[in-house]
Amino acid sequence: MSNNQTLIAQCEEKARQWLSPAFDEETRSAVEAMINNDDKADLIESFYKDLEFGTGGLRGIMGAGSNRMNIYTVGMATQGFANYLKINFKDKEQISVVVCHDCRNNSRLFAETVANIFSANGIKVYLFDDLRPTPECSFAIRHLKAQAGVNITASHNPREYNGYKAYWDDGAQVLAPHDKGIIDEVNKVKVDDVKFEGNKALIQIIGEDVDKVYLEQVKTISIDPQVIKNQHDLKIVYTPLHGAGRVMIPRALASWGFDNVHCVKEQMVKDGNFPTVDRPNPEIAEALTLGLRDAKALDADILMASDPDADRVGMACKNSDGEWVLINGNQTCLIFLWYIITNRQAVGKMKPTDFIVKTIVTTEVIRKIAEKQHVEMRDCYTGFKWIAREIALSEGKQQYIGGGEESYGFLAEDFVRDKDAVSACALLAEICAYAKDHGKTLYDILMDIYMEYGYSHEFTINVERPGKSGADEIQQMMKNFRSNPPKELGGSVIDVYKDFQSLEITKADGSKEKMDMPDTSNVLQWFCTDGTKVSVRPSGTEPKIKFYLEIKDTMNSASDFPACEQRAAVKIEAIKKSLGL
């Protein structure tokens, strides 16, 4: 029997378990069709493994099968989570959780399934009445003093996906030791163990009551309300890309005093099929096509777009030639943290112990700003749970004033412990108002930062490798980079190697030192003598390996920018060649 035939036989055996009466008729017929189909590709992809409850929860394609998002995989995850909560909070009279969801197909169904299972286990559930932004889920956990939370979302993944994010009592995604503890409990659960029959008496619907308190808190992060009064009619175009931002972001902007906000009509419609975009990802130009159409027609000052669960924000503005350009995640993070630092200092809100946080793959220019302004900057792993961890570690001792990552996630407050597109959109609008009040544009602010702290060009290469064979290939690539690391990148000599799996820093002369990080992570970083930085990591949520490139240069005036961009583009191609990409 060949390896492929063995795999098919194993998948068929597993699939037949899904034909039992424990599963509904629709699921059974979908599984039967896979078994009977001569092409076994669907069968293999749906059953070759169990959808893994990872450190962030679940993420996968919706459909029948053990490797798919459905009420059964969601149900087993929730039962395991409930079991862990009952062990961990055994002395608490009434455990409570918050359940939230985005606009995706089946999101409400999955959220109600989660609520039913928690309540059937004697756990009180605060269930949002409709879709809400991810940051509001985090806020609600803290505000309602719940022990945990679940958010049904797949962020900006394609429409076929859905996901399940697990939160702890501080409103952050679960970290050690609870992540491993929950995973262990989830892995013990079989479908027959799941208590699907809900207890309505333990489910409380929440909505506007939490919305109001959240919006009031978001208002408190404004640094310079006067510039908003001066520029209240700033022309803002906003799109939620059919997602949860539609509920809160226009309200947040209005509450800050912006009274000239235009929402992209076609994309204000809640729709998990995302009919107006190929991918609902504010990082990509195609998703902003309609937003740019409206921004040009209205001669707007800024365009902002949030992803389906409204935790990330993409932005566009006019350059010095009056052309609309996308501002990438690193650039937005630069503008965001530069404004927070310099303007908190200007209005006397800064304390010597205040700190900011960025992720290891985010631009090093932020380090330069922090050093020059004498502000503590911390580096952490990719993923906002690590930024939340830094906030928690310093609670009551030092004040977190802002953080962000290159993947379009930003947080300016500590009453939320996940990235927040609601507060970020409001603060970015304030920054735009500040620029206009000083006779500048957002683009001018970016150029000013490059001139003062150094030009930087960041470029991410995503190498997609779907399915089981893809996962194996990605593993092999990382193995090869470790055993045979490059010596140069596009002509730039590497002088520092960081391996976050072994937590070792290796210098070009062979000397080694240990890194102080809270955990290991499958990430490699190479630093060159000319400031070039390359980071390599497999994605935690998608079947791809990511290469983060950062190229440095000097910019004496805004007119130097095109030449810097050209040199960076040449350098990127040379680095790709060095890496065999």
PLM regions and their residue ranges:
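Gly/Ser/Thr-enriched, mixed-charge loops and adjacent short helices
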Residues: 18, 22, 26, 42-46, ...
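Phosphate-binding and adjacent anionic-ligand microenvironments
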Residues: 296, 300-302, 323-325, 343-537, ...
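Short Gly/Thr/Asp-enriched flexible loops that form oxyanion-binding sites at enzyme active sites
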Residues: 110-118, 161-168, 311-331, 366
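N-terminal small/polar loop signature for handling phosphorylated ligands or for N-terminal nucleophile
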Residues: 98-161, 259-314
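Glycine-rich phosphate-binding loop plus the immediately following alpha-helix
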Residues: 167-195, 330-354, 358-368, 421
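Conserved phosphate/anionic-ligand binding catalytic regions in large, soluble enzymes, centered on
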Residues: 47-67, 154-157, 236, 240-252, ...
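An N-terminal, well-structured beta->alpha segment
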Residues: 5-114, 204-236, 244
